[in-house]
Curated annotation (Swiss-Prot):
BP-aspect Gene Ontology terms: translation
Gene3D superfamilies: Glucose-6-phosphate isomerase like protein, domain 1 (3.40.50.10490), Helix hairpin bin (1.10.287.610)
Species: Lactobacillus acidophilus (strain ATCC 700396 / NCK56 / N2 / NCFM)
Molecular function, one GO term: structural constituent of ribosome
PROSITE patterns linked: RIBOSOMAL_S2_1, RIBOSOMAL_S2_2
UniProt keyword annotation of Lyase present: no
InterPro entries: Ribosomal_uS2, Ribosomal_uS2_bac/mit/plastid, Ribosomal_uS2_CS, Ribosomal_uS2_flav_dom_sf
Composition bias type Acidic residues, residue spans: 244-258
UniProt key word Ribosomal protein: yes
Family: Belongs to the universal ribosomal protein uS2 family.
Name of the molecule in the record: Small ribosomal subunit protein uS2
Region of interest called Disordered, as start-end residue ranges on this chain: 226-258
GO cellular component, one term: cytosolic small ribosomal subunit
Gene: rpsB
Keywords, ordered alphabetically: Ribonucleoprotein, Ribosomal protein
Length: 258
């Protein structure tokens, strides 16, 4: 099987550039190739292998109908996280992570229901008959909920996997996933502790192109896995239909009409 991404793609996206040597986590030492001008250089041979592992893991979960949550709230990640999660038919948080998003899912669901209620009110004409001041307050509430919860508005349940850009910044999300036993796949830079991460992808987590490349690969894995699931379901339906047809033939042979 060919690698998910090529060495050339990783280099062009700047995936190999880590943080300054004075800002490092010693636990990332196994993934560092060298240092240059005070910057750690990530070992891209290891990145390629671990990215392949992450791809296969995401694909396998998708084949089983898994739900994925992409998390990246830093400015460089926001667009890629939203676009790639949406492309894969999954969910995202790209603004501030609300504490309890996973560990207090019931409360989050109530806020999502409120968001849907406000959207319905804005679309069915309710806002047209309310006082302007009240409409302004409701609109402000709706916009705030949309900003923080819009990416998980249709998420049917707690996700099976988190994909995270910069787990150091998203430590609350990672901690909640760890508490619930949800596997975390993450882009981990040289300044970050990899221990809370189940599937580490050693990578620059600050460059927009690097984030887009890795997030895109994860979305591709989900899409491929879902396609495999669809193919299996089609085969199962075909098999059942053929089996039903065979039973009818056997029944007809055993009970021929007089």
């Amino acid at each position: 099987m060919a690698d998910v991404v090529t060495m050339k793609q990783l280099l062009e996206a700047g995936v190999h550039f880590g943080h300054q040597t004075r800002r490092w986590n010693p636990k990332m030492a196994p993934y560092i190739f060298t240092q240059r001008n005070g910057i750690y250089i990530i070992d891209l041979q290891k990145t390629i292998k671990m990215l392949d592992d992450a791809y296969n893991f995401m694909k396998a979960v998708a084949e089983d109908g898994g739900v994925f949550l992409f998390v990246g709230t830093k400015k460089q990640a926001q667009d890629s996280i939203a676009e790639e999660a949406t492309r894969a038919g999954q969910y995202y948080v790209n603004q501030r992570w609300l504490g309890g998003t996973l560990t207090n899912w019931t409360t989050i669901q109530s806020r999502v229901r409120r968001l849907k209620q406000l959207k319905e009110m804005s679309e069915d004409g309710t806002f047209d008959v309310l006082p302007k001041k009240e409409v302004a307050l409701l609109t402000k509430e709706m916009d705030k909920l949309e900003r923080f919860l819009g990416g998980i508005e249709d998420m049917p349940r707690i996700p099976d996997v988190l994909f995270v850009v910069d787990p150091k910044k998203e430590k609350i999300a990672v901690h909640e996933a760890n508490i619930l036993g949800i596997p975390v796949v993450a882009m981990v830079d040289t300044n970050t502790d990899p221990d809370p991460i189940d599937v580490v992808i050693p990578s620059n987590d600050d460059a927009i192109r690097a984030i887009r490349l890795i997030a895109g690969a994860m979305a591709d894995a989900i899409i491929e896995g879902k396609q495999g699931q669809d193919d299996e379901e089609t085969l199962e339906v075909d098999f059942k239909e053929n089996a039903d047809g065979s039973e009818e033939i056997v029944s007809a042979e055993e009970n021929p009409e007089d």
